[in-house]
Structures are given as C-alpha cells and as structure tokens.
Amino acid sequence: MNEAATVLGTADIQEILRLLPHRYPFLLVDRIIEIDDDNSAIGIKNVTANEPHFTGHFPEKPIMPGVLLIEGMAQTAGAICARKTGIGSNLVYFMTIDNARFRKPVVPGDRVEFHVVKQKQRGNIWKFHCDAKVDGQLVAEADIGAMIVSKEDA
C-alpha cells in the first residue's frame, strides 16, 4: 500500500455505510482495502449463495448478474468521490458506462475485487476505468462516469 492509501486508510462496512446511500440488498461493496486519495481504490464483495438475485439467476447454476458487477464498480468509485468531496453533503450519480466486457462468471463463494482508477476529472464529472477480478483473474471491466451533485441541488 502506498503512502497516500495509508493516510486515507481503508473502509470497513461501517465506513462504507457512511459513504454510500445504498443498503441491503443493493449494497455491493463489503470493504475497501485500499484507497489512494481520489486516484484509485480496491473494493471487495464476498459473494454468497444467500443473495436474493441467485433465486432467479439461475436457480440450478447461480451466476452473479453482470449488471451487479458494474454496480459494485460504480459503488467503489462512488466511495472515492464521497470521501474526497465531503461525506454526506453530496450525492454521486452513475452517469455513463462504456466498453463493458464480461470475461468469466462469478459464482457463490467467489471474492470479487473491484479495482477502480480515476482517468480524469472535469468539474463535477469524474471518469473511471474499472476491473473486477476473482483470484487475480479478470472477470469484468468497464469505463464509467459519475457526476457529483450537492444534496441541496438534487
């Protein structure tokens, strides 16, 4: 972990609940193990068989829906934005998704790492490249955009 990440530390579930408005069953980040200022982060999702989406996707062979992998990436990016711009004073809106690719299925028992790297920022618009990995292997990737807005203006 580099020096900037050490300064900002990690985020356990209690910190994530302060950073993000999402709650069960839509909170898709269990922990953030590394934050490098507003440049990058690694979020963790422990996938369990008890998650509600597995009852229909698919009952005989449960696979985590790709859209939820994208949402986990967006939540990890959102935590970076919220931590940098002021916890509780702003909302982070998911704006764009480009170049999404799904490489391998994610199943119960997997530990997904969401690697999020800020590519650029212009005003209140932030762009990120995101990779989702299981056991070091790429399972999904996407470029996403987020907009930061004041809660008063939302």
From Swiss-Prot:
Organism listed in the record? Rhizobium meliloti (strain 1021) (Ensifer meliloti)
Q: Which GO terms describe its biological process?
A: fatty acid biosynthetic process; lipid A biosynthetic process
Pfam families in UniProt: FabA
The answer to whether keyword Nucleotide-binding applies is no
Give the chief site where it resides: cytoplasm
Q: Which reaction does it catalyse?
A: a (3R)-hydroxyacyl-[ACP] = a (2E)-enoyl-[ACP] + H2O
User: By what name is this protein known?
Assistant: 3-hydroxyacyl-[acyl-carrier-protein] dehydratase FabZ
Quote the SUPFAM superfamilies the UniProt record gives.
Answer: Thioesterase/thiol ester dehydrase-isomerase (SSF54637)
Quick one: a GO cellular component term?
A: membrane
Q: Where is the active site?
A: 57
